[in-house]
Amino acid sequence: YIYTSYVGVPGLVRTTITDNVINADIEWELTNNTPETRAAAVTWNAPNGFGVLGTWQTNGRPNYLNTEGELKLSNTILNTIRKVIPEGGNCPVDYRQSVDFEVNDPEKRDVEVSVRFIGGTSSAASAFGYYCYRGEATKAKIAATKKYIIFPNTHTRDAKAKPVGLKGGECVKLHYIDENGVDQGTVFPNGVKIGWFLFNDSFKKNGNKGNITLYSTPKANSNGRTYTAAFRINDFVVLSFEDYTIDQDYNDVQFNVWSNPIEAIAPEVPEVKPDPGTDDDRSVAYRMTYKGILAFEDNW
């Protein structure tokens, strides 16, 4: 096997050795993907009280992926993220802050929001989701919001026989969930804030027993702690979560979040210089119409 902590590519790759030469096809390899239904899942159902955007397969691969939003990320973006929040490193204090996305289109157009899976370094199989709210984020308000699962399984390492159901760059379009917990479709009105949660190592563990949920809204966390860091690579915003073990590297699971139109989501965060990359990928890094990345540090 070849192992890498490089985010955005498969973390564990099978190899062969012939005449002292190592051979490997560096491709995403998913585990079994038998379809399952929302009502009769044979492996993992969303915990009671959580909403879902559709059905998924037994490896946690959503049946509602948005292929139009799928993207191969440039080396420029991936190298920059890796250098800022490396595996086993220490995320700079200046970037540690709380950032939930707020929809605010200056022209008051219809806004759609999507999330793209980037990858991660975790050996945990965690579910990732979101919630919508308006105004001040009180603990009671966030507790009352309807939580929706986007990706039931964010595991990418094929470690400890855990399933792999996602490839880097795959995408889901979100739905606006109003204050009554009702799905209002894909158009988000101005003034709505979107928070995020990571249900740590929950996939295939029968609901929420023995797992910890980490939130991007500090008041929603039991200790009130800010677990997020944020920085900007040109117009590309990275958000990260620190886990319960507080190992400070903030890189376990990462996501790209953007809006259409792109002006509708524009958080104010510190800027870092992009990695130079190569001539053949710079145009990709700057022309794509995405607005941000979420990176979660889990509780593994």
Model regions: which residues?
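Extracellular distal adhesion/interaction modules in secreted or cell-surface proteins
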Residues: 1-300
